[in-house]
Amino acid sequence: MKLIKSTLFISLSLIAAKGFAQYTDVINSNRPGASRSAFSVGTNVLQFEAGPYFINEKRTPAPSYEVEGFGVDFAARYGLLWEQLELNVEGTFQSDTKTYTSTIDAEDKRANFKFLTVGAKYLVFDPYKNAEEDKPNLYSWKANHKFKWKHLIPAVSVYAGVNYDTDKNPYTAVGIEGFSPKVMIATQNNFAGGFVFITNFIKDRIGTDQSDFQYILTLTHSFSPKWVIFAETQGIKSDFYADNLFRFGGAYLLSENFQLDTAMTLNTKDTPSVFGVNFGMSYRLDFHQDPYKEIDNGTSAKDEGQRRSRRNKNKKGDSDLINSKQKRETVDFN
């Protein structure tokens, strides 16, 4: 019973910390999904997220082909100046072999960045800020898990970044090279019971022939202080590529600053079909310090002078009272 209470207390504390502040006592990673949290890593926190993956794509209708290879997703995130601000570098590098399955098979070995982006994210609205009444109730499981309408109001952040695409990149449309802007709106709802719902709405490579729109919906559930599972759907729409991807996976908190994760990606079409598996890790260098708040404990020179003045007045009053008593006692009535 004590173990259950301790586990419940730790879980609620972590959920509360994640809900009411940018900085959290444990690492807050975007992995292993593709969505981005509305919250930053916290000021003076440098965080690295990376993971290799294996990919298989197969197109059945003509022109038919099959892709097999591997890649790595990576990100570096840093909280700068304010709790709401995060600077980040993100990208995916892939190396594969594309085999055209026609009368005469032909192979095309490819390797390049699928995307490489530098940007900044800023939290513009935080409904959980200063929400004292939403802190966990250590005496009521029901109170901690009941639905509250205000939880439907999400935290909202905005993102702006710049893509860089190299010339003759096999993973982009013909003629896509150089720099192009990327913008995103991210929302996050922290529900009771360890559920978190994240949405991303993205406009990528704006102003190019491959300007696509994406949405990502992610639901995560933390069922213990160490384990979390997630399900995610991602829609991509552009003239170059369109797809609906689904991801499932989980993560394990190895320590306060180190997380391991894995996920599976698939879709439901054959132009091409997609199947991928990834394994990853997230690690942070935590130099965060809570902002200093000056506490008035009455030790200023002015306060000390006022206290001494009051003490002197009290001493003088006591002295006058004693002298008065002594005078009354020495009166001669004879």
Predicted regions and their residues:
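Positively charged n-region of N-terminal signal peptides that target proteins for export
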Residues: 1-6
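Transmembrane beta-barrel domains of Gram-negative outer membranes and organellar outer membranes
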Residues: 22-206, 210-263, 267-334
